[in-house]
């Protein structure tokens, strides 16, 4: 960090005789530091600057710049505070950007952190002239200290910003609200008494001033809101002239009570007893980068508490969705009125209209959130409730005589920008969750609490089963009869709650033990789209963690239905192939009638238990990145982008404007049907054969999952332009070793495609030195045959040309015509209304591999 203050030299015009008050703030840009890193506040007070020698001719003013490397450590080099004399750079008597350092001095912060200097101290500033330091100036330092930031002060300073109005920013919300709620952070064990930080009297005075100022602002805001509500309160005479006042006055009073209670919950420091300075002091969590994905805070009480986050949270079942965050502030004091209950019943009975109002309209989002909020139990504990799925209404009609809510949760949520990488896992266009909001079921938490018994001991394995289809329901029934650690998930909220709880328990184990935990084996039983949901949660959660977390979990793939990753694992591990890729297993979970005739259910349990106990070899599956750019909903709106991790296959389809229906905006609808294809496409099947074979929507093939209902299978022709860059082969890299830049070649395909498929799965079991992808395309070609008599050309269609291109490092795909939108299938999850997309062979964060357990790298002998 650096801060500059301009000072005038003696005798120079505009010299300042009064001290310049400045506050120095560090930009927290560190994520790889140790969990014990504690933010500190450096306070520096300068008294006088004395220039002993002439710095430069015709120098009228100088700038005092203070610079510190952040983070600084107690026992490491570079822990220095630099104070520099600088001047603005000039070119031909014109001031340009930048500063030139005239003299500099440094202070060892390791000594300051242990013994703050309160007396007078003189720092010599030296100028380097011909590699010989010459003392040219001196600075008198009154005080210099470095103190940990008080958790209580930070919360109090954040109070007026994050909880008063909508004028706060997202950065303030994340840094003060979300971070401090993360009670599973390693810093949470550092409960220190306030006297430990009591170094000097100015610190106490500053704390009391900050607390008094923030509480004054909160009280002023509350008084303004109360005065505003009373100003618009309808008098009883007016109510008597309209209707019976008994019908409306209680509702108004309940609304006011709800508002007051909400303000009291959100501003707990308004009253007298809370002003006593007797609470313990917590250090704030370590500074970190803005997360790639914005998820819920990893609270240790996550198995019991759920809350409302936003209407965008549950966007993509069965892909991960944010578990709500705000119910904690709404529980306890709310009373459900009859009017609200009637509103819930009416809105739940209204069917969803196909062409309703946009999802971002405040009417739709606010009404949905209000209904969902009031339906929650008064305690706010999810463990008390069963699954709650409430259809939202698309119409703006309300019951006659009913008043709207005076406050809504939407008004207290921070604005979330669209083009934000942190929001990339929140799909903003999913149709399923526009029609319903979900919260985790009680049975999920019951199963988790039964498996995760204590913080001191972690289970060896956990089996997550997707019970939203018949395959998962059948498998869960079989496994539960044998008392295996099964967690049944049937919605995005269930998956989110289960995975977040596992991560939270691992964090609590790390906080209680000095040794790292033994890797927890997490079996994922479901189709490809279910693994995609787990992968996104894995990337989201571990992007906030240190690299050590990459070794705390191992995943086991139990395929139920179409699963390209399972086919790949079968090609590198023959025992895995015999267990889960043989004909008996595929027939059992691909044909609905097969389960009724199955008598040997112990064989299923035996395969799974042998796989869990015997698969101890970690196969690092590379994670690729897909960046989708959606069309804007209005001309004034910018295009939104999403970053999606994937490990398997990406397929492309196209939607013509003529065949576009109201469902075109329903992107990211998971291709999970209750009936799976009886013959899932294998890796050896040609793309043309896949195109011609009729498959149900659950199959991720282009013909079944991407074609419009009005289009035939043979009419799936796509006019695309594909730009791709191929990485150099190992032999080419040796030949070009002398070159600095890695050679890449750009190629372009611009033609009519029958199918386009990009795979990140390695071509062989061994990981390549350079991360690359492979692309398989089937193009439609025309052969121009010359007719000599009429001398005209006649187009004759020939067989489709199939082509496989390997070694691709980056790929960009867009439609030939801008009005055509793409449908992209990423690991079994469909996304539509895509203008163009880009694929990169490697994920950009430190989470670059997905650890999967196999028996060993041994190819099958067949």
From Swiss-Prot:
Family statement: Belongs to the PACS family.
InterPro entries for the chain: Phosphofurin_acidic_CS-1
Disordered: annotated segments: 151-215, 263-436, 658-713
Listed Polar residues bias regions: 332-344
Ranges annotated as biased composition (Basic and acidic residues): 313-328
Low complexity composition bias: residue spans: 263-272, 658-693, 700-710
Key words of the record: Apoptosis, Endoplasmic reticulum, Mitochondrion, Phosphoprotein
Biological process, per Gene Ontology: apoptotic process; autophagosome assembly; protein localization to phagophore assembly site
Chain positions with Phosphoserine modification: 361, 387, 424, 662, 665
Subunit description: Interacts with BID and PKD2. Interacts with SIRT1. Interacts with HDAC1. Interacts with TRPV1. Interacts with WDR37.
Function: Multifunctional sorting protein that controls the endoplasmic reticulum (ER)-mitochondria communication, including the apposition of mitochondria with the ER and ER homeostasis. In addition, in response to apoptotic inducer, translocates BIB to mitochondria, which initiates a sequence of events including the formation of mitochondrial truncated BID, the release of cytochrome c, the activation of caspase-3 thereby causing cell death. May also involved in ion channel trafficking, directing acidic cluster-containing ion channels to distinct subcellular compartments.
Location relative to the cell: Endoplasmic reticulum; Mitochondrion
Protein name per the record: Phosphofurin acidic cluster sorting protein 2
Organism of origin: Mus musculus
Main localisation: endoplasmic reticulum
A Pfam match: C2_PACS_N
This protein's GO CC annotations: endoplasmic reticulum; mitochondrion
UniProt KW Nucleotidyltransferase keyword: no
